[in-house]
Every structure is written in structure tokens, then in C-alpha cells.
Amino acid sequence: MAMVASPDDIVKSPLPPPPPPPPPPLPPAHKDKAAYNPYSGCPAHGGDDGLDGIVLVLRAAAALLALVAMALVASCRHGDWMEFTRYQEYRYLLGVAVVASLYSALQAARTFRRMRAGTAYAATFLDFAGDQAVGYLLITASSAALPITIRMRSAVVNTFTDVVAASISFAFLAFAALAFSALIAGFRLSSSSSSAYNY
């Protein structure tokens, strides 16, 4: 005769624990690509990549050097043939030095304001082209004034020729500062374009 187990004899096994809830979905990777515009600058990715200070120093140095070159040329008013206004090369050098000083000072102030605001510098085509254009003016002005200065100094060396030679040297140094600034702007512009369009 079969034995039927009573309910009390049945050992109730515990229920298995419920499965853990699924982890929350990961947020999508953040990419600053939509706002990129090469003519107005790419969006800042936050922080300073170490080049902002170099750009500021280069542009401030270019402004100061061009200002010194301008002051030196303008001071060459010694009468007779020692008047810078008698030579179109020196008038051109003076005009270019004024333009370079104003441009570099405005760009330095713009960079400094961005650094104070905590905004990462975004290179633009205008920065790149502006540095190249003003640098080209400086090197052409220096090259135009150099031959006539060499001819003068081969005949006579005085305060006029010394000051003009110093002005040419400062203009060339201002060109070098803007040339390095243009290199940095081109590098950062290329890097920003690559990161913005590299999916």
C-alpha cells in the first residue's frame, strides 16, 4: 500500500532571489561637433591646452616690438637728408609698424580676455590669415628699408642710420613673433578641424 506524504512532511524549498535590476543605460558619448564653424572658431573643449599663454606672449611681444620700431622711425627727424619722410621705404615701414602694433595689441587683449573668462582659445581662419598678412607686411617693409640703409651706412654712420637700422631689426623681430603665432594658429585650426569631422 502506497504511503502518501502529509503536507507537514513536505519540505518547502525557498524561492530563488529575483534577478538584479539591469544597469542604467550609459549616456551617449559627448561630442562637440555640431557647433563647429571654421570661420568663427570651433567650440571650446574646456581647459587650457598650454598654448594660450604662448600665443598671448607672442602677440604682446609683437605689439611691443612693432611699437618700438614705429617710435624709432618717427624719431628720425634730424633735418636735411636725415628725415625719414624723404624716403618712401621708411614711410612704408612706419605705416606697417603702426598697423602691426594695433593688430597685435588687439589680438593680445582678445586672447587675455578669453583666458580670464576661462574659455579655451579657439583658432579661427581670421587669426591664421591675420597673423600671416601682418607678418608679410612687416617682412616686406623691413626688406624694402634694408638696402637703402645699407647704402647709407656704407657712406656715413650716424644717429640717423643707427636708429633706422634698429627700427628694421625690431620690425623683423615683430615679424618673427607673428610668424610663430601663425604657426600655432594653423596647428590648432588643423587639430580642431580633424577632431570635429573625425567620426
From Swiss-Prot:
Superkingdom: Eukaryota
Keywords in alphabetical order: Cell membrane, Membrane, Transmembrane, Transmembrane helix
Similarity field: Belongs to the Casparian strip membrane proteins (CASP) family.
Signal peptide from the UniProt entry: none
Membrane topology field: Multi-pass membrane protein
Pro residues bias: start-end ranges: 14-28
SUPFAM superfamilies xrefs: Formin homology 2 domain (FH2 domain) (SSF101447)
Classification via PANTHER family: CASP-LIKE PROTEIN 4A4 (PTHR33573), CASP-LIKE PROTEIN 4B1 (PTHR33573:SF36)
Keyword Transmembrane helix among record annotations: yes
Spans traversing the lipid bilayer: 54-74, 92-112, 128-148, 164-184
UniProt keyword Membrane, yes or no: yes
Places the protein is found: Cell membrane
Residue ranges, Extracellular side: 75-91, 149-163
Cytoplasmic side: 1-53, 113-127, 185-199
Chain segments carrying region Disordered: 1-32
Major place of residence: membrane
Protein name: CASP-like protein 4B1
GO cellular component: plasma membrane
Subunit structure: Homodimer and heterodimers.
Organism: Oryza sativa subsp. japonica (Rice)
